[in-house]
From Swiss-Prot:
This is ETS translocation variant 3. Disulfide bonds: none annotated. It is found in: Nucleus. One of its GO terms (biological process) is cell differentiation. Residues 35-116 bind DNA. The gene is ETV3. Transcriptional repressor that contribute to growth arrest during terminal macrophage differentiation by repressing target genes involved in Ras-dependent proliferation. Represses MMP1 promoter activity. The lineage of its organism: Eukaryota, Metazoa, Chordata, Craniata, Vertebrata. GO terms for cellular component: nucleus. It comes from Pan paniscus.
Length: 512
C-alpha cells in the first residue's frame, strides 16, 4: 500500500458488498480503476460506522442521503489518493452516473440520490455477493413495499413464463433483500421453500391487485432464476394507482406472452390497458402466439390509446405496431348547434378602377362577338337637341333616376324606350355598367352624357373606349372643354340645377 492512500478495509466474510479483487489493487496508480465511486458509496452504506455520514433513506428502496457531503468527499479523496477532493468534484462524478443510468438525483431532496437497481446487474463482476451474513445491518436498504417503484426501463426477460405483472418483485429480488444467508447451498434450499408457496403468500399479502395476475402463484417455480451475481432488481416499473395519473388501473388481466415494457418514462400518463409490447423483431420470443389478442380487448385498448393521444397531446408514434389492426375512429360527439353548417354568402368587394376597366373591356368585347349586335350601325339622331324644351329633359332625367334607384344597375332598354323621341332605334348596352351611379360625383355624368349626345357630333368607338377607361373627373373635364353648347347650358343653370342639383354645379365649378 502506498503512503497517504489509506483505503477502507476490504470486507471479510460476507459482511457487505464484496467487490472484485481488481478494485482493491493497491499497486495500481492513484486515480486509476482502484474502485469506482458508486462501488465506494455502496461500501460506505454497508458500514455501521458511516451511518452519520451516509445512510439509506427509509421508505424508498435504493435511495440514500449524504448527511455530511464534506466527509464523504474526504473519504473518497483518501481512497483515490486525492487530498484536494471536495463535494463539487464528487457531485460532478455522480452526475456522470446519471447518463449511465446507474443512479439519479431525487428531485426536491437535497443530497439525496437513488440507485437504479434494474441497471446494476453486474455480469462483469462475478465475485459480488449482495447479501450480508446473519444479522441485517441497520443501514441495509429498506425492504421494498408495494408503493415503491422505479421509472427506469427494466431488464430484458429471458423466459416467456417470467412474471409479466408490473410493480412486483421477482423471486430473485426477494431473496436479495438481505434476509437470507450468503452461501450457495442455503440459497438452493431457500429456493425450494419459495417454490412451495412462501412467495405466493407474500405476493397475496403485499399486492393489492393480485386479481390481475395472469400466471398465478404456482408459475413462480418455473421462472428462470437470475444468477447470484446481481443486485436486487425489479421485474419492471410499477403499475400501481398513481395519484397524478388521469387513468385508473385497468381491470383487464395482463397477457402472459406479452412484455409489459414502457416506451419512455415520460409516457406515464398513457393508459395501460395493455402495457406497451415491443415489436416481434425486438422481442425475445418471436412466435406469433405472443400476439393472440382478444378483438374486443384490442378495440378497447386502441380506442383508449387514441383518446390518450388526442386528449393529452402525445405523439401517435407511441402506438405499438400491429399490422392487421386498424385504430377505431375517435367518437367525438359534436353539439347540435356546432354541427349545423351555416351557409355564409360573401358579397364581392366593390369594383376598383382596374377591375372596372377589365369588366368594361370584357363586356365591350362580348357584344362584338354576337352577330346581332355586330351588325347594328352607329346611333342616328333624329332631331337636334336645340329643338327640345327643358321640360322634356327634366322629365327624362327624373325617370332615369327613379329606375336607377329601383334596379341598382344602369338600365339600357327602358331608358332608350323612354328616349324614343331622341333615337331612332334601341341603344346598345352602355359601356359603363359597373360604375355606381348613386354617388354624388357620378350623378352629373348622366347629364353630361345626355348633353354630349345632343349635339350633332357623335363620338366614334375608339373615343367611347377611351372615355370608358378615363377617370370620371378627367372625362367630365374633357367634355366640358370640348363642348361649348354644354358649357352654355351649365352656365345658364337650367340643366345642372334641374337634372342633378347643386352637386353637379359644384363639381363643374371645381373642374373649371
Amino acid at each position: 500500500m502506498k503512503a497517504g492512500c489509506s483505503i477502507v478495509e476490504k470486507p471479510e466474510g460476507g459482511g457487505g458488498y464484496q467487490f472484485p479483487d481488481w478494485a482493491y489493487k493497491t499497486e495500481s496508480s492513484p486515480g486509476s480503476r482502484q474502485i469506482q465511486l458508486w462501488h465506494f458509496i455502496l461500501e460506505l452504506l454497508q458500514k455501521e460506522e458511516f451511518r452519520h455520514v451516509i445512510a439509506w433513506q427509509q421508505g424508498e428502496y435504493g435511495e440514500f442521503v449524504i448527511k455530511d457531503p464534506d466527509e464523504v468527499a474526504r473519504l473518497w479523496g483518501r481512497r483515490k489518493c486525492k487530498p484536494q477532493m471536495n463535494y463539487d468534484k464528487l457531485s460532478r462524478a455522480l452526475r456522470y452516473y446519471y447518463n449511465k443510468r446507474i443512479l439519479h438525483k431525487t428531485k426536491g431532496k437535497r443530497f439525496t440520490y437513488k440507485f437504479n437497481f434494474n441497471k446494476l446487474v453486474m455480469p462483469n463482476y462475478p465475485f459480488i455477493n449482495i447479501r450480508s451474513s446473519g444479522v441485517v445491518p441497520q443501514s441495509a436498504p429498506p425492504v421494498p413495499t408495494a408503493s415503491s417503484r422505479f421509472h427506469f426501463p427494466p431488464l430484458d426477460t429471458h423466459s416467456p413464463t417470467n412474471d409479466v405483472q408490473p410493480g412486483r418483485f421477482s423471486a430473485s429480488s426477494l431473496t436479495a433483500s438481505g434476509q437470507e444467508s450468503s452461501n450457495g447451498t442455503d440459497r438452493k434450499t431457500e429456493l425450494s421453500e419459495l417454490e412451495d408457496g412462501s412467495a405466493a403468500d407474500w405476493r397475496r399479502g403485499v399486492d393489492p391487485m393480485s386479481s390481475r395476475n395472469a400466471i398465478g402463484g404456482g408459475g413462480i417455480g418455473h421462472q428462470k432464476r437470475k444468477p447470484d451475481i446481481m443486485l436486487p432488481l425489479f421485474a419492471r416499473p410499477g403499475m400501481y394507482p398513481d395519484a397524478h395519473s388521469p387513468f385508473a388501473v385497468s381491470p383487464l388481466p395482463g397477457r402472459g406472452g406479452v412484455l409489459n415494457v414502457p416506451i419512455s418514462p415520460a409516457l406515464s400518463l398513457t393508459p395501460t390497458i395493455f402495457s406497451y409490447s415491443p415489436s416481434p423483431g425486438l422481442s425475445p420470443f418471436t412466435s406469433s402466439s405472443c400476439f393472440s389478442f382478444n378483438p374486443e380487448e384490442m378495440k378497447h385498448y386502441l380506442h383508449s390509446q387514441a383518446c390518450s393521444v388526442f386528449n393529452y397531446h402525445l405523439s401517435p408514434r407511441t402506438f405499438p405496431r400491429y399490422p392487421g389492426l386498424m385504430v377505431p375512429p375517435l367518437q367525438c360527439q359534436m353539439h347540435p348547434e356546432e354541427s349545423t353548417q351555416f351557409s355564409i354568402k360573401l358579397q364581392p368587394p366593390p369594383v376598383g378602377r382596374k377591375n372596372r376597366e377589365r369588366v368594361e373591356s370584357s363586356e365591350e368585347s362580348a357584344p362584338v362577338t354576337t352577330p346581332t349586335m355586330a351588325s347594328i350601325p352607329p346611333r342616328i339622331k333624329v332631331e337636334p337637341a336645340s329643338e327640345k324644351d327643358p321640360e322634356s329633359l327634366r322629365q327624362s332625367a327624373r325617370e332615369k333616376e327613379e329606375h336607377t334607384q329601383e334596379e341598382g344597375t344602369v338600365p339600357s332598354r327602358t331608358i332608350e324606350e323612354e328616349k324614343g323621341t331622341i333615337f331612332a332605334r334601341p341603344a346598345a348596352p352602355p359601356i359603363w355598367p359597373s360604375v355606381p351611379i348613386s354617388t354624388p360625383s357620378e350623378e352629373p355624368l348622366e347629364v353630361t352624357e345626355d348633353i354630349e349626345d345632343r349635339p350633332g357630333k357623335e363620338p366614334s368607338a375608339p373615343e367611347k373606349k377611351e372615355d370608358a377607361l378615363m377617370p370620371p373627373k378627367l372625362r367630365l373635364k374633357r367634355r366640358w372643354n370640348d363642348d361649348p353648347e354644354a358649357r352654355e347650358l351649365s352656365k345658364s343653370g337650367k340643366f345642372l340645377w334641374n337634372g342633378s342639383g347643386p352637386q353637379g354645379l359644384a363639381t363643374a365649378a371645381a373642374d373649371a
